[in-house]
């Protein structure tokens, strides 16, 4: 048994300049693991609680009382004494002990950020002690599937101060032989998009996730630019065949739902400020009207995937969406399911989605995350491994995507080091796999539950 000998947490900064927690774990046999916890901007109401220093003795340390020293103290003073001496390879036991120590449904006592930091650092320490890559430790020797990247090249919603209500407009390079070739294709599209934006007089500043954040007149205008950038790069806007590059959307509809209607608040405000009537013809939608709007977009553009097309409380909207379009398009639940097994079971029973987004900090432990992934895959769903808008140089999700053969990873655009770090890690993993056997990149086939 390889015992944990030391656990130490500290407060550092994430990609938005906000405090987050980093945890180091040491083992008796010389293993070491360190993990940095991400943070989201648009969050589901049922997510595990990220503990901040509001109304504590640390409240005034950082802007907006966003410090995490309370979570740091919880690791160093409460969690550490309980897990020191345990075997670092017994991940589930350690995760369960932390869940029991917390004792709340959403980890609000110790903080999901405190618990997750320890959970991930333990796994990394075990892998390090065994002198193997994290993806091998988590997945064994079988996984060889490299994920198709979902690159958020146009940001909107809560991730950017622009006019777009949809949060992410992504490209998915499908028609390529390797992950590296796919990334090279995405690189060309990204830079050609910048060129086209500049040529049309748009700014090319980037949002939280490294994508451009122009003030477009409509969501359709954003999609038109994506199609043009794909063509300008010499690729095929579509799902199938050589050089195919598809589009994916994260609508994050909970952010523009007022409890009764879906309102494109940002586009509407832009229209009013410009006194223009020729922008999006409609800014307010019932659930049924929004479904029809998505149908128009799916008919016009090569969109393969839509995430959070409806608000997290609008189960009927999701069910209707999946029933109508789920045979040919990936219908992803994020805020709807928050990487929670019990909520995922409901979504499966209701046939509300055919894919789940996986975010480690939504649930708060590695074990629970793996449970959600395995349940989704067992039920015929795809599982998309995802970053958060507040990220760091931590590359855990890259290893996780390969370990579980998810086939898809969503980790931002091709700018900002916090996003690039994950892509660089995947390039290294692909090289590692090719040195032993052959890394697989199967493009369109990752959508194994869609009609061919």
Swiss-Prot record:
Its main location: cytoplasm. Binds a second Mg(2+) ion via substrate during catalysis. Gene3D superfamilies: Enolase-like C-terminal domain (3.20.20.120), Enolase-like, N-terminal domain (3.30.390.10). Pathway: Carbohydrate degradation; glycolysis; pyruvate from D-glyceraldehyde 3-phosphate: step 4/5. The active site is at 209 (proton donor), 359 (proton acceptor). It is found in: Cytoplasm; Secreted; Cell surface. It comes from the Bacteria. GO terms for cellular component: cell surface; extracellular region; phosphopyruvate hydratase complex. GO terms for biological process: glycolytic process. It holds the Pfam family Enolase_C. The keyword Iron does not apply. Its cofactor is Mg(2+). It is an enzyme of class 4 (lyase). This is Enolase. It comes from Mesomycoplasma hyopneumoniae (strain 232). The gene is eno.
